[in-house]
C-alpha cells in the first residue's frame, strides 16, 4: 500500500494543531497564539554564543530547527503565519529560504532584522498567548506562557499524529545507522572518542544536531548512568560497551540504548541476553489503559528475577523491591514520553487542565506516571548496574545479606546493562519502532 506523503501528513497534522490551539486559546481567554523560535545566547564575559536550541513549541508547527529570531503566529480561522528571519550577514551561513512540504500550508514573511517582526505580529500584545523564553521579548511582546494554554497543549502533545510518527521513524533509522557503526568501532577496539566519532559520521550529525549528548561507555563506565566523558584511549582489557545515543529528524528525537559484551561466551553476555528478552516483553505490555507506573514496578520485579537467577540476589524479587535493594541495581525509571523533546512534556499531567500524578514512593526518577493511551510514544529502557555508591547504601541500610557480593564483584568491571526501544501505544498491540530497524539494518 502506498504511504502518504509528508505533505499530506503535514496537512492533517496542522489541522490537529489548529484545533488544539483553538481550544487552548479559548481556555486561556486569548485571541492569538504567538510562538518565538528563540534566540542565540552568549557566554558570560565572551562574544561566543551557546549552541542554539529551538523552542519546542515552535518546531511543533514547522520543521525548522536553525532559525533564531523567527515567529509562528496563529489566529483561529486563519492560516498560520511564519515570520522567517533571514538576515543580511556575511559572518555566518544564512538560513535558506523556506521550502519543503510545509510551505504551502502557511503564510510566510521574510524579515532581515529581528525588529521587523513587530509590524507582522498581532496588533495587541495583551491579547496574545506568547509561548517562549524571556530572552525572546520583542517590544511589548513578552512571553507570558499562560498556564491554561500550556497545560492543554502540552498534555495533547503526548498523542502523536501520523506525521509525527513518520518523523520519529526517520529518527530511528538515522540512529540505528549510528548504532551499527558504533558497535563495529567497539569490535575493532576503538576508544570511546573514536566510537563517538564513528557514530556521528554514520548519522551525519554532530553534538549540535543530536538530540542529547551521546553516552559511549566502555567497561565500568557503563555504571555511570549519563557518562559523557569520551575517553581517548581504549581500556585494556576491553570487556563491555554501553551506548545510549539518538538522532534528530526535522525536530523529532530518537533515544536508543544497547549493550554489548566483548566476549560472546561470557556470563555478562548471558546477562545482556536475559535483560534484552525481558525488555522485549516489557515493550509488548505497552497497551491502552495500562498504568505506566505499574509497568515500572513490574520491570523491577522482572530485573530482580534475572539477578536472582544469575546468583546476584539471595532474596526474592518481591523482597528486593520492598526493601529498596532493587533500586540499587535499577536506579532510574523505566522510560518516558518522547517526541519533540527526548524527555517529552506532560509525563506527570493529571489532565489537560493541569494537576500532577505523583511517582510511586521510593521511585524518584520515574519520568512518566500517566495511564497509556493510543498515540503515545514511550521509551522502554530497563537497566541493571553495579554502582559502588548505591551498593554501599545497601550495606549501610542493613541489607547486605540480600546480595551475593562475590557475584557483584565479578560483574562490576562490566559496569552495567541498559536496553532501550521506542514503543507506540495503539488501539491494539504495541508497535516497537526500534527493533524492526535493527533487524533490517
Curated annotation (Swiss-Prot):
**Alphabetical list of InterPro entries matching this protein:** Creatin/AminoP/Spt16_N (IPR029149), Creatinase/aminopeptidase-like (IPR036005), PepQ_N (IPR048819), Pept_M24 (IPR000994), Peptidase_M24B_aminopep-P_CS (IPR001131), X-Pro_dipept-like (IPR052433), X_Pro_dipept (IPR022846)
Highest taxon in the source lineage: Bacteria
First-tier enzyme category under EC: hydrolase
> Which HAMAP family does the UniProt entry name for this protein?
X_Pro_dipeptid
Cofactor(s) needed for function: Mn(2+)
Q: What is its EC number?
A: 3.4.13.9
Function according to Swiss-Prot or TrEMBL: Splits dipeptides with a prolyl residue in the C-terminal position.
Q: Which PANTHER family match?
A: XAA-PRO AMINOPEPTIDASE 3 (PTHR43226), XAA-PRO DIPEPTIDASE (PTHR43226:SF8)
Query: What Pfam families does the record tag this protein with?
Result: PepQ_N, Peptidase_M24
A Gene Ontology annotation in the biological process aspect, one of them, is:
proteolysis
The note describing how and how many cofactors are bound reads: Binds 2 manganese ions per subunit.
Binding residues annotated for Mn(2+) 2, in chain numbering: 244, 255, 420
The name under which this protein is listed is Xaa-Pro dipeptidase
For this UniProt record, the keywords arranged alphabetically read as follows:
Dipeptidase, Hydrolase, Manganese, Metal-binding, Metalloprotease, Protease
Similarity annotation: Belongs to the peptidase M24B family. Bacterial-type prolidase subfamily.
Q: Does the keyword Metal-binding apply?
A: yes
- Where along this sequence does the record place binding of Mn(2+) 1? 255, 336, 381, 420
Q: Looking at the UniProt record for this protein, which Gene Ontology cellular component terms does it annotate, in alphabetical order?
A: cytosol
Amino acid at each position: 500500500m502506498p504511504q502518504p506523503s509528508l505533505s499530506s501528513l503535514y496537512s492533517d497534522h496542522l489541522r490537529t494543531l489548529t484545533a488544539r490551539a483553538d481550544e487552548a486559546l479559548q481556555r486561556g481567554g486569548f485571541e492569538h497564539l504567538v510562538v518565538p523560535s528563540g534566540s542565540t545566547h552568549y557566554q558570560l564575559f565572551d562574544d561566543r554564543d551557546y549552541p542554539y536550541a529551538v523552542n519546542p513549541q515552535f518546531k511543533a508547527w514547522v520543521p525548522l530547527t536553525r532559525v533564531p529570531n523567527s515567529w509562528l503566529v496563529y489566529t483561529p480561522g486563519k492560516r498560520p503565519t511564519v515570520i522567517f528571519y533571514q538576515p543580511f550577514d556575511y559572518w555566518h551561513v544564512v538560513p535558506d529560504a523556506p521550502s519543503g512540504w510545509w510551505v504551502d500550508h502557511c503564510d510566510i514573511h521574510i524579515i532581515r532584522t529581528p525588529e521587523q517582526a513587530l509590524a507582522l505580529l498581532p496588533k495587541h500584545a495583551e491579547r496574545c498567548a506568547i509561548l517562549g523564553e524571556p530572552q525572546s521579548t520583542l517590544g511589548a511582546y513578552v512571553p507570558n506562557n499562560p498556564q491554561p494554554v500550556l497545560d492543554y497543549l502540552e498534555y495533547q502533545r503526548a498523542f502523536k499524529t501520523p506525521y509525527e510518527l513518520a518523523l520519529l521513524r526517520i529518527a530511528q533509522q538515522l540512529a540505528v545507522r549510528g548504532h551499527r557503526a558504533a558497535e563495529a568501532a567497539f569490535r575493532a577496539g576503538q576508544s570511546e572518542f573514536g566510537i563517538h566519532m564513528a557514530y556521528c559520521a554514520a548519522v551525519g550529525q554532530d553534538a549540535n544536531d543530536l538530540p542529547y549528548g551521546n553516552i559511549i561507555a566502555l567497561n565500568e563506565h557503563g555504571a555511570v548512568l549519563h557518562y559523557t566523558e569520551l575517553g581517548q584511549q581504549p581500556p585494556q582489557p576491553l570487556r563491555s560497551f554501553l551506548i545510549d545515543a539518538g538522532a534528530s529528524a526535522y525536530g523529532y528525537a530518537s533515544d536508543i540504548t544497547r549493550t554489548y559484551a566483548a566476549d560472546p561466551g561470557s556470563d555478562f553476555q548471558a546477562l545482556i541476553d536475559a535483560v534484552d528478552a525481558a525488555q522485549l516483553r516489557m515493550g509488548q505490555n505497552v497497551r491502552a489503559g495500562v498504568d505506566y507506573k505499574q509497568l515500572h514496578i513490574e520491570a523491577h520485579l522482572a530485573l530482580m528475577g534475572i539477578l536472582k537467577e544469575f546468583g546476584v540476589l539471595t532474596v526474592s524479587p518481591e523482597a528486593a523491591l520492598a526493601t529498596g535493594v532493587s533500586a540499587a541495581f535499577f536506579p532510574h525509571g523505566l522510560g518516558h514520553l518522547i517526541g519533540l523533546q527526548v524527555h517529552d512534556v506532560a509525563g506527570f499531567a493529571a489532565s489537560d487542565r493541569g494537576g500532577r500524578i505523583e511517582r510511586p514512593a521510593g521511585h524518584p526518577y520515574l519520568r512518566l506516571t500517566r495511564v497509556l493511551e493510543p498515540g503515545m510514544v514511550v521509551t522502554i529502557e530497563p537497566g541493571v548496574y553495579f554502582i559502588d555508591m548505591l551498593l554501599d547504601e545497601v550495606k549501610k541500610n542493613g541489607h547486605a545479606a540480600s546480595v551475593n557480593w562475590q557475584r557483584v564483584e565479578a560483574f562490576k568491571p562490566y559496569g552495567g546493562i541498559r536496553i532501550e526501544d521506542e514503543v507506540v501505544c495503539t488501539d491494539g498491540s504495541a508497535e516497537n519502532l526500534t527493533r524492526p530497524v535493527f533487524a533490517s539494518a
